[in-house]
From Swiss-Prot:
This is Catechol 1,2-dioxygenase. Disulfide bonds: none annotated. GO terms for molecular function: catechol 1,2-dioxygenase activity; dioxygenase activity; ferric iron binding; iron ion binding; oxidoreductase activity, acting on single donors with incorporation of molecular oxygen, incorporation of two atoms of oxygen. Coiled coil: none annotated. CDD domains: 1_2-HQD.
Length: 303
């Protein structure tokens, strides 16, 4: 069918639809219709897609978000993350995808505390410390850091195969007046994302592996600053250069160091250590970048 048909669908939204809804739905309709025409979709193709979408919903529950997994596999979450966190302040810590395993309200621990409520024999403990600052290096006291990770078997606390408490390997920490934080965790491990559902089927169609590199998740917030959602990646992990969800960025690849006799406070407690500083962009810089991007987009539409 012609572009005239597509235009009739795009302009059919009622007067109470918000401007943002009109913009997004019209754009979605245009791209979906173009996709169908470009690939000459058949009814069989369309039904396969409908079933795929249905299975995403059926596979999802409070412990698993299959929709996020599918978006990750096609790189959509990484793209949206980049657009969301665009800023003129180039020296802030890079963001990364949230992923499907975030849980709010993790336990608050004092600095130096451990998020390891229950360990398994293959877990390797690590101590992480650093400072949270603004992009000029000013310490940000009172910043909130939420961290979470999987165990060495590759399972997060809400997954059925994770043998541990609900908030195992999750915790919240508050920086001191000088912006310092510290906590005990595990040296991260790589793992395959769940591939027993439609996300896994899509990976097989794409002839891709399901493995994510070793990483720790972070969510860092402070009043007046843009909330940073990111991950740090182990430089020694073979999947750091071949992430199944395309989320790795060069400046959030880190090197874990072996604890030695110079680290008297850590010897006998953990095997590895990491010093890692975080820099937050102001919320205003993010909003200014978004406004500039929107202005550029509007100008392109008028051309």
């Amino acid at each position: 069918m012609s572009q005239a048909f597509t235009e009739s669908v795009k302009t059919s939204l009622g007067p109470n639809a918000t401007p943002r809804a009109k913009k997004l739905i019209a754009s979605l309709v245009q791209h979906v219709h173009d996709f169908a025409r470009e690939n000459h979709l058949t009814t069989e193709d369309w039904l396969w897609g409908v079933d795929f979408i249905n299975r995403i919903g059926q596979m999802s529950d409070s412990r698993r978000n299959e929709g996020i997994l599918v978006c990750d596999i096609i790189g959509l979450e990484t793209l949206v993350d980049a657009l969301t966190n665009e800023s003129e302040q180039s020296n802030h810590t890079s963001s990364a995808i949230l992923g499907p395993f975030y849980l709010p309200d993790s336990p608050v621990y004092p600095n130096g505390g451990s998020i390891v409520q229950k360990a398994i024999p293959t877990d390797v403990k690590c101590f992480v410390r650093g400072k949270v600052t603004d992009t000029e290096g000013k310490p940000l006291g009172g910043a909130q850091l939420e961290v979470w990770q999987c165990n060495s078997a590759g399972f997060y606390s809400q997954q059925a195969d994770h043998d541990g408490p609900e908030f195992n390997l999750r915790g919240t920490f508050i920086t001191d007046d000088e912006g310092n934080y510290s906590f005990e965790c595990l040296r991260p491990t790589s793992y395959p994302i769940p591939y027993d559902g439609p996300a896994g089927d899509l990976l097989k169609i794409m002839d891709r592996h399901p493995n994510r590199p070793s990483h720790i998740h972070w969510r860092v917030s402070h009043p007046g600053y843009h909330t940073l959602i990111t991950q740090i990646y182990d430089a020694e992990c073979p999947y750091t250069n071949n992430d199944s969800v395309y989320a790795v960025k060069d400046d959030i690849i880190v090197h874990f160091e072996k604890v030695d006799n110079k680290d008297k406070d850590l010897v006998g407690k953990v095997e590895y250590k990491l010093d890692y500083d975080i820099s937050l962009a102001t919320e205003s810089s993010i909003q200014e970048a978004r406004a500039a991007a929107k202005a550029r987009q509007d100008a392109e539409i008028k051309l």
